[in-house]
Amino acid sequence: MQIAILSFFHYFTLMFKKRESVFEVEEGKFLSPKFDKDGLIPVTTSDSGSGELLMHGYMNEEALKKTIETKEAHYWSRSRKDIWHKGKTSGFVQKVIDLRIDDDQDALWMSVDIGNGASCHVGYKSCFYLSLIHISEPTRPGH
């Protein structure tokens, strides 16, 4: 499982590089994340086994570096204004299996192993446990 993470480390330079060109961002071998005006980058997290969407959060530069270094998920808590090592208190640590950055380097997708744990602070596996629309059968146009 660590092969995917190690290939990420070997492919990208761990030091964040200033964004110099579109080509360098999209095709280069340097990690040049684009943080927003608040210094954050969005991260979508899914279960490495099932692919289930677990949560959406944010990382600042320090959280991203800690995640890469420890191979455990660290987020930026916007409410507490602090680094949040996911599972440090609850015991439901998210072990990083794969961490990807999109072509513009302005969004992250992280695949994690949570064992039999939860990702949601209220105890559910996924923070997306509230369904707004659920279509059980495909609908056909005109029917």
Describe the residue ranges of each PLM region.
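A short, polar/charged loop-to-alpha-helix boundary motif
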Residues: 61-76
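Short, basic/aromatic recognition patches
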Residues: 16-38
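Short, charged/polar surface micro-motifs in flexible loops or helix N-caps
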Residues: 48-50, 60-64, 105, 115-117
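Short beta-strand segments
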Residues: 31-60
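Single conserved hydrophobic/aromatic residue that forms the stacking wall/gate
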Residues: 133-143
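Short, positively charged and aromatic/hydrophobic N-terminal segments
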Residues: 5, 11-13
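Short, structured beta-strand-loop surface elements
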Residues: 73-131
